[in-house]
Regions:
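Short, well-structured N-terminal submotif of metal-dependent ribonuclease cores
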Residues: 1-38, 47-64
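Active-site neighborhoods of divalent-metal-dependent phosphate/nucleic-acid chemistry enzymes
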Residues: 44-46, 68-116
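Short, hinge-like loop/turn segments at secondary-structure boundaries
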Residues: 49-53, 91, 130-133
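Short acidic-hydrophobic, aromatic-tinged amphipathic segments that line or gate anion-handling sites
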Residues: 74-75, 129-131
């Protein structure tokens, strides 16, 4: 299993997605997991005023992603919350709540996170995969 960060999923919405990321996603598709934390982050992004023009397209895309991964969506549970609390107490400058919650999910399940933002997660000790660097 691999938890996929928002920046990886968002690559799919670009006009010219990075071929390395697309190849990585295709290769690992059966192992990919969608986090409810990522769903919240994507939803937040397209609710912002600057996304008004593309909101309908992003809503359809997110609905499709949720449907495609309905049996591979990771909820945020009490174990995740406990680990999040530990991480939040040690928070480094620049760490945001959603990243820490995603890291907590990965740590609780002992699985890696696929992300481009390796530096944001490295201090948590979570296993990381950067599809841009593979």
């Amino acid at each position: 299993m691999i938890l996929v960060d928002t920046n990886i999923w968002s690559e799919l919405t670009k006009r010219q997605s990075d071929p390395r990321v697309l190849a990585w996603l295709a290769k690992h598709e059966p192992d990919l997991r969608l986090s409810v934390i990522v769903i919240a982050e994507i939803r937040t992004g397209y609710e912002l005023p600057r996304a008004r023009q593309i909101r309908p397209m992003l809503e359809l895309w997110l609905d499709g992603l949720i449907a495609a991964y309905s049996d591979r969506t990771e909820a945020f549970d009490t174990r995740d919350a406990q680990i999040y609390g530990q991480l939040a107490a040690q928070r480094t400058e620049g760490s945001n709540t959603l990243d820490l919650q995603l890291a907590a999910q990965a740590i609780a399940r002992n699985i890696p996170i696929a992300t481009r933002n390796v530096r944001d997660f490295a201090w948590t000790g979570v296993k990381l995969i950067d599809p841009w660097a593979v």
